[in-house]
Amino acid sequence: MIRALEAVIISTDNAAKLAEFYREKVGLKQTEEMEIGDKGEKGFDFDINGTGLYILDHSDIKGKNSHGARVMFNLEVDDIEKEFERLKKEDVKVVQETYHVEEYGLIATFEDPDGNYFQFVQVRAN
C-alpha cells in the first residue's frame, strides 16, 4: 500500500545554483546540504510540510530541460496573487499567469533556471 509521496527529486548539472533559486527566490526552507558519492556532487533538501524536495547534481544531466511541462509540482499558497507578484519582482520567469480551474482553485505556472516548471496553487476552501 502506498502511504504518501515522500519526495520529489530534481536532477541538475548545478545543484548549488538551482537550490539557491528555490531558497532565495521561491522562498523554500532548505533543511540539509549533502555530498553525494565520491565525485563531489552536491545535494540539497527542502522540506515542504513533510514532503521532501531534493535538488541533486547528476553527472548525466547537461543543460536546461527542453520539456519543462513534462513533470511539474505544485506548491500550495494562501494568497496566490501576493505570491505571484513576489516572484515576478524576483524576475522568476512566468509561464502562465494566474488562472481559475473550476472546482479546484487558482494556478500560476513558473519556470526555474533549469527549465523545469512548477506551479503555485490556491485551492478553493473545503
List each model region and its residues.
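N-terminal beta-strand motif that seeds the catalytic metal site of vicinal oxygen chelate
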Residues: 1-19, 71-73, 124-126
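Vicinal oxygen chelate
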Residues: 1-3, 90-126
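Core segments of cupin and vicinal oxygen chelate
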Residues: 9-52
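Short amphipathic alpha-helices in soluble, non-transmembrane regions
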Residues: 23-25, 86-91
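Exposed loop/turn and edge beta-strand positions of beta-sandwich/beta-sheet ligand-binding modules
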Residues: 40, 69, 104
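Short hydrophobic/aromatic beta-strand element in the GNAT-like acyltransferase core
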Residues: 43, 74, 107-109
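Conserved beta-strand in the GNAT
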Residues: 54-56, 119
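Mid-chain, well-packed structural core segment of small domains
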Residues: 69-87
